Amino acid sequence: MHFREGALYMSVHISKKAELFYKALGDIWVAEQTWHGNPNIAAWICTQAAEKTMKGFLRCLNMDYDHGHKLTALLEEVESVYNVTAETKTYIIYLDDFDLSLRYKNMPNDPTPEDAKTAISRAKHIMEELGANPKISPYIDEAKEVHNKIIRASNEKYMN
């Protein structure tokens, strides 16, 4: 670990296949910190976590993927190689609706804190389901290990 006054820098290594899962975990962590005061930010960042999770899934299988932000388009790509549950499909569609309504004007949406909590739960569920695939789980485990190490180090640095 490398510290500079006012900032935390850690030298960590993470594989390319775990990288997007690591970023998705960071998004979920930020959403968990902000849902009560900034539910629109928390809900939107959960769409980012779902996007990174699905792209990470496809990356782990050495598949090319759409570089856009439409979750339902990514879902189609994931479904071409994996049987996604109906529940998870509805969660992805739910989050995709947040993404559109928060990105563009004149779309009806003003997420409540409860909506943000639901978005967090659904983003976590998507990662859990896709991470249950034995070809994917080692990379999610790696991402969780690095994420937790950084959170612990940050807490030690700034909470003591």
Predicted features, each with a name:
Residues 1-160:
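Terminal alpha-helical segments
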